[in-house]
Amino acid sequence: MKRLTVFIICILLLASGCAKKEEKASLFAVDPLNGGAKTDEAALPGPKGAAGLETVPAAEPASTADPEAAPSPAVAVTGTAAYVFDGAEGPTLYGAAAYENTGNCPVIITNAALSFNVGGTAYQYSFVPIMNDKTVVLPGETSFVAFWHKDSSLTPGTAAAMTASLDCAKAECRDVTVYAKDIFLADNYPGFTTMTGTLSSDGECDLNLVYIGFYDSSDNLIGVWHFTKNAPMDGSDSKSFSIHMKELPIDGLAEKAASVKVIGIGF
């Protein structure tokens, strides 16, 4: 009788161990630590996407613009975020802004003027966004700017806030739009987030620039990341990407982000 009891207990322990192993199924559509290799997609969350994220297209061109009206370039800032990070090369001031093309023609940003309040001290910077001449934003679309500035006098973790003033100019229509989907985030130790996903395009392009804005459950901007994928696209294929965002060490970004907005440019 004792032997039978021991046998039954062993069987129950084995069954319990198997159940625990099944709970550890990968949450990634693309494994960021394995060169983009595919993992078990059956274990992925539902249609809301990566770790509960909802991918909201930032590209929503307005259909009401009068093609015969005189060009009237205009943008409106819709959200900002600011932090003092402990960067790889020392304390780093970071700022990001989301903006909408509220005019009636395609635009580019020609200058971004940022005003920071860091622990009660004011800082002001102006810069021209990366590849600004290529980043054409259509009427009704949302896009982003992001800024990093090393400053050894700052203390990482100090409370920071920012306002932004953006100058824009009329631009020609964008040649190629790049799309990002299946975006997954994972918070890693010590203090950075990995992002994976898939890029596609509506035409041929050799280079690209992609902006991704992270939003919380109240639709407040948490931060912005931009990157390029060194891979030509012809409009019929897709390319996976995997990025360790070590220069955006927002604590618990994957946990805080409820949705992302994406805009991509091909050229």
Language model: regions and residue ranges:
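Membrane engagement elements in two modes
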Residues: 17-209, 215-267
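Sec-dependent N-terminal signal peptides of Gram-positive bacterial secreted proteins and lipoproteins
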Residues: 2-22
